[in-house]
Amino acid sequence: MKLLCLSNGHGEDGIAVRILEELRKLPNAPEIASLPLVGEGRAYTKADIPIIGPVKKMPSGGFIYMDGRQLWKDVRGGLLGLTCAQNRLVRRWAKRGGSILAVGDIVPLFFAWSSGANYAFVGTAKSEYYLRDESGWLSRSRGLEGWSGSVYLPWERWLMGRRHCKAVFPRDRLTTSVLKQFSLPAFDLGNPMMDGIFPATPEPIFYDKAAGEKEKVRPLKVLLLPGSRVPEAEQNWQLILKAVTNILQEFSGRSVLFLAAIAPTLDIDSFRGSLTGWEEENALPEDAPINDISALAFSREGGQLVLTQNAYNACLLGADFAIAMAGTATEQFVGLGKPVIAFPGSGPQFNYRFAEAQTRLLGHSVTLVQKPEETAKTIQGILAKPDRLQLIAQNGIKRMGKPGAAARIARCLLEKMSE
């Protein structure tokens, strides 16, 4: 069997790669190829998965659904010609007997259906949580957005219901249950976004009779997530630093350790240069939960800050709270059962529209404030309510699922494509 994976975005590429790597481990694994519809597909290249067609980085970075001006930039940048060439290639793949895995939204799903090949769909972009939760419809979404009875529109469900569509893998249990009501081949196997965060061999945990006292005096660890796009991430960083200042002012009686996870594609000097009033240190703080010799450490009264580009997972696992202006990273942090504070930026990705939608997707785990200066009091309010922290922990796991989804999807995919 031959399998072509279509994906349309950096995050989608990463999810696709996790599934394909698990497929490779299975007996009778298919011959695998990829075609990223947006961007250059570096995740595939890094995983040594061949890319079989034309790729190109677009000006929008894949956020054309957020802004019509971004779409026009992409059209001028060659989007239409690229899309036509990719569509022809997918059709040729189908004529040669290959199957297709579509990862993302309606674009790769449409490509897969129009090819005539057998296909499966991993729906990363949509969730019923945008419209409802387990208790019912959200009041603000019952109108136009929920008119068809699902976050997936009738034409999207039509594409999932064709006889060549062998399986649909939604991102959460709620979405799966709704799609099953429309007699679609939906499987609740989890969200691959949560795979690969925990170490393959966890560190041993030893009993410490002084653990309670240590917990009282240890620093509060706050993860800083400015996003991964230039120049938006640098603009977001300026807002995040206002929140950092606010926290240091309001938490004067407790030390705070800020962990800034900066994407490797960004210039760290731009973030370093903004730390006015911070003194650079020669070594990482003792409480820093990372092992990165390239990380930069800074301090000022009441706080410490670490800039790292090589310890993303360790930062996620080690932090208590996150100040986040990101997409995938925010969802992963929530999936660990931890609280997020967010405030809107100027975009094009993390604007108010995106941030508000994210709060619907992730529920109680994300608190959206209007300005950075509201961050400290929000954190204090959450810390003062243990029941709320417990609710946040349960909510995150429910909405994002447990690790191991990629392997479960891979096994089901191979089974359904072989029938």
State where each predicted segment sits.
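Nucleotide-activated sugar donor-binding and catalytic core shared by glycosyltransferases
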Residues: 1-419
